[in-house]
Amino acid sequence: MQNISEQQVKGSKLPNVICMLPGSSDKVIIVGAHFDRVSEGDGVVDNWSSASLLPSFYEGLKNGPHKHTYIFIGFTDEEQGEVGSRFYARQMTKDQVAATDAMVNLDTLGLGPTKVWVSHSDKRLTDALVQTATRLNLPVAGVNVEQIGASSDGEQFAERKIARITIHSFSQEAFNARIIHTSKDKLSAIRLDDYHQTYRLLATYLASLDQFGGSLPVPTAH
């Protein structure tokens, strides 16, 4: 994996980790996941389940032609208030913001089938994910998490008027099980079949986003 850099973040001991996969145009798709965790549990679900997939998505995209430059980012200190993503988003220049067609945020995967935080996701990006899932015959559903006080790194990009989507696996069942931010957050909490389906869906989805221009039209399902 080439083009890896570390971005020192003011106030954080650990940097953001950034990997760029250059495309043939100046347009950009950001794919992000935080790698930090709270002290309770192992942090497997929240959020190594997401951060550990970033290299796999890179490998899946690197050998095919693509117009967009994909920027994969492991964000630091999300659990401290989206510190890493806030720093990254705020240091983006106006030209960088204008060039960014989408920000795909991954947080807490593998508790069950793929979910989307619909109320905090761009409708066009959400529609494109649903169409991809339909094409692959894979499950996806909308579950909003703001009512439990949740937030995530995608919100920092929304403040810069960048289209974003947050993909997760949270549900009422998972909430009732009290897995997140507890000692139950360990490998045994991951439902591997659901996790693999989420990976398949996201790998295809990220590739399909390259078809989009700045207006992000929804591609025709086939």
Short names for language-model regions:
Residues 113-222:
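Active-site-adjacent substrate-binding region
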Residues 24-26, 34-37, 109, 172-176:
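Short connector loops/turns at beta-strand edges and beta->alpha or beta->beta junctions
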Residues 20-25, 218-219:
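N-terminal hydrophobic or amphipathic helices/low-complexity stretches enriched
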Residues 2-9, 73-75, 143-145:
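Conserved beta-strand termini and adjacent loop/short-helix elements that scaffold enzyme active sites
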